[in-house]
From Swiss-Prot:
It comes from Brucella abortus (strain 2308). HAMAP family: UPF0178. Belongs to the UPF0178 family. It comes from the Bacteria. Pfam families: DUF188. InterPro entries: UPF0178. This is UPF0178 protein BAB1_1980.
Length: 161
């Protein structure tokens, strides 16, 4: 992964990410490096350019820990994991969920509190189920959010390497 402080890169929490193909296409269009981080081997299409695979081992949060450690201004982190999103924002990264939700410093506190509350309710048997199934509108929202994040970073002085 290119680690120049003024370059844009995309870090992907890849184990359950439903938008990897979209990330590859957008990254190729903008000539950006992508780092796919997972707890197990993830296939990368042969035609995907500038994609690095990082397979971490160890605990369940090893991929999240790796991404948090490598988050920085100029990085776009793609994750559905709210605690990871919070850590990445603390490091100055831009954060997008696979459904297109853009996390910011001003929204992550409420999002984290809601996640923790729902976790507690599920543990107590009060709430069952999880998030809604991934839908085509989520894919579209994600593509828009990723393009917006890249444009904002370029306007802020970051560039493709």
């Amino acid at each position: 992964m290119e680690n120049e402080p003024d370059t844009i890169c995309i870090l992907v929490d890849a184990d359950a990410c439903p938008v990897k193909a979209e990330i590859y296409r957008v990254a190729e269009r903008h000539n950006l490096p992508v780092v796919i981080v997972a707890n197990s081997f993830i296939a990368i299409p042969r035609e995907a350019q500038r994609v690095e695979r990082v397979v971490v081992s160890g605990n369940l949060d090893a991929a999240d820990d790796w991404i948090a450690e490598h988050s920085r201004p100029g990085a776009v982190v793609v994750t559905a994991d709210i605690p990871l999103a919070s850590h990445a924002l603390e490091k100055g990264a831009s954060v997008i969920a696979p459904n297109g939700r853009i996390h910011t410093q001003s929204t992550i506190g409420n999002t984290l509190a809601t996640r923790n509350l729902m976790d507690s309710l599920r543990s107590a048997g009060e709430v069952t189920g999880g998030p809604a199934p991934f839908a085509p509108k989520d894919r579209s929202a994600f593509l828009s959010a990723l393009d917006l994040a890249i444009v904002r970073l370029k306007r802020a002085g970051f560039h493709a390497s």
